[in-house]
Amino acid sequence: MRIVVAHNRYREAQPSGENTIVDSEIAQLTAAGVEVLPFIRSSDEIPSMSKAAKALLPISPIWAPRAQHDLSRLLTEHRPDALHLHNPYPLLSPWVVRTAHRHGVPVVQTVHNYRQVCSSGIYFRDGVICQDCKGRALGVPAIKHRCYRDSAAQSALMATTLAVHRGTWRSVDRYIALTSAIADHLREYGIPDERIVVKPNSVPDPGQPAPLGDGFLYMARLSPEKGVDLLLDAWRRHPVGALGTLRVAGDGELRPLVEAAAAERPDVVYLGQLDRAGVRAAVEASAVVIAASMWHDVLPTVIIEALASGRPVLGTALGGIPYLVGADAPHEPAGTGPAEVASAVAGGGSGSGGSAMPAGIGLGEAGWVVAPEPAALAAALPVAQAGAPLLAPTARARYERTFHPDVVTKQLINIYANLPQTPRNP
C-alpha cells in the first residue's frame, strides 16, 4: 500500500499538536509496512521565499499553483493508492483534492478543526463560542471581526477560500472525524454518513500506570478558549487544601492569572512549559486531569495521555471531550461502560463516598463532564477527587481499546483499504 500524506506544517514557533500527530502517524504507518510518500510544506518556508513566490501567497489558499505542479509530478511518478490530507493552508490549498482526483487518486482528510465553515477554525471569538458563519455562502462575520490572523484582508481571503472550495470539500472520498462531535459537524456541512469514519488520534503507550498521585493536573495553552480562568474560579470556591494540589502546566497570555493564583494559594502550583519527561512526571503525580475548554475542543491530546496513564479526566461537555471520556455513547465491554460505572458510583463503589451522582455531572467510562461554568466545575471537583480510584482502571482500559497506536493504525489502514476505486469529482 502506497499513501501520500499531505500536510502544511504550522510554524515551529507556534507549538502544534497537529504537526506532532502527522509525524507520529507517518511513523506508525511506516512501521506497519505502508509506503508513505510525505508531501509536506511548512509555513516556516515563507520568510525565505523568493519575491515571485511571495507574490503568489495571497492566492495560495485558493489554488497554490506550485503545490499542484509538484503534487502532479509525485502522483504521476508513484501512482499511490490514496492521498491523505491534513492541513492545506496556506501553501497546499484544498485544490490538492482536485489535483489528486484528476490523477484518479482517492482522497482521505483528517478533520482537525472546523475550518470547512469557520475562518479561525475554532468556533470561538471574544471569549465565547461563535458560529455566526454557519449556513452562510460567504463568512462575512469572519471578515468583520478579523477572525483569521486578526486581519480583515486575510480573513476576507480565507472566507473566500471556504466559499470557493465548498464543492471541493464535499468531494472528499472519506473523512476521518477525530471524535463523534466532528462527525456531527461534517453531517451538518452536508457530508453523508457513509463518507465519515470516526478515528481518534493515539499517543505512545507509557506502560502500566503508576499508582494514583494527589490532586489535579491542568495542562494546556494558557489562553481564554482553554478555560484556565474558568478552572481557577472554580478552584477558589473550595477552601485551601481541601482538594489536594492543583498543578498547572503550559504557557500563554493568561500566565499572569496562574502565577497570581499560585502566589495567593499554596495548593496551586505553576509548573511552566514542560518537556515530555516533565509531562509524564506531572501526570503521574496527579490523580485526575482537567480539560476545562471553553470552545468545542476537537481532541485535546492531554486527555488521551491521561487515559494512557490510568488517570480519569474531568472536562467540560464541549466538542470531543465527552467522546474521549466515554460519556457520549453506549458502553462497550460489559461492566466497563458509563452505565455500569454510574451504577457503581451511585451504589457506593470504591472512592464514591456512597452518594449519588450530583445533578449536572455527566459520568463517562473514564471521567466526568460538566457545563463550562464555574459553579458546575466547582461542584464536580470533589466528585472527581472521590471517584478517581474507581475510574482509574477503566481509564486505562479505554485507552488500550480505543486510543492505543496499534488499534488506531489498524483502523487507519482499513480506511485506506476500503476507499472507492473511482474518486469523486467536485
Residue ranges and their predicted role:
Residues Q116, Q131, G135-G207:
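Donor nucleotide-sugar binding/catalytic pocket of nucleotide-sugar-dependent glycosyltransferases
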Residues P256-G278:
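Nucleotide-activated donor-binding/catalytic signature segment of Leloir-type glycosyltransferases, i.e.
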